[in-house]
């Protein structure tokens, strides 16, 4: 688990956290590390000397990231509202957007970082892509796509669907 946090809650702090989360996502994808990220804003306590972290924002971010069944960055509604308030955009697209987020047993409405648009110049394959194409780089570490269990294959298929929809 990697915890990114700011000492403040200003819009510039939010911008910094979203930039860092997106850069982390980009680096992880380039290194073929499938990650899920959750971003929340709110009460958060930390003690750097003891490496202790706690608070509702940490728990919310954890649940947002871990419940998503894809490679992506899920945010809280408060993060979405603040990103809109700050007019955070990549080109003409909002950085945080409403989306259907795949979860166990279906999907739920929520908010996500529009990383396929932000990282559009880093995505090697032309869109649209399939789940198998998203997975290609990971195969060297995790084996052939066909050997993955259904639930794991679906994560890559959900990721491809989001990439195709958001960057269209």
Regions found by a protein language model. Name each.
Residues 53-55, 60, 83-84:
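Amphipathic alpha-helical "stem/stalk" segments
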Residues 29-32, 36-37, 58-79:
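Catalytic/regulatory signature loops of cyclic-dinucleotide turnover enzymes
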Residues 20, 57-60, 134, 155:
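Alpha-helical structural motif
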Residues 1-16, 26-56:
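Catalytic core of nucleotidyl cyclases, primarily class III adenylyl/guanylyl cyclases
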Residues 70-168:
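Intrinsically disordered, glycine/charged-rich C-terminal tails and inter-domain linkers
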Residues 2-3, 9, 13, 23, ...:
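Generic detector of bulky aromatic hydrophobic side chains
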């Amino acid at each position: 688990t990697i915890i990114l946090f700011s000492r403040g809650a200003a819009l510039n702090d939010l911008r910094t956290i979203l930039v860092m989360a997106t850069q982390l996502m980009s680096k992880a994808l380039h290194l073929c590390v499938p990650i899920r990220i959750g971003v929340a804003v709110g009460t958060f306590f930390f003690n750097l000397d003891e490496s202790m972290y706690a608070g509702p924002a940490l728990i919310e971010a954890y649940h947002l990231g871990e419940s998503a069944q894809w490679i992506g960055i899920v945010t809280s509604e408060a993060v979405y509202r603040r990103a809109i308030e700050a007019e955070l955009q990549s080109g003409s697209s909002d950085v945080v957007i409403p989306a259907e987020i795949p979860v166990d047993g279906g999907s739920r409405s929520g908010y996500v970082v529009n990383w396929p648009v932000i990282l559009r110049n880093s995505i090697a394959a032309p869109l649209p892509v399939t789940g198998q194409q998203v997975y290609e780089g990971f195969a060297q570490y995790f084996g052939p796509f066909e050997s993955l269990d259904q639930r794991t294959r679906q994560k890559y298929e959900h990721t491809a669907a989001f990439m195709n929809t958001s960057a269209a």
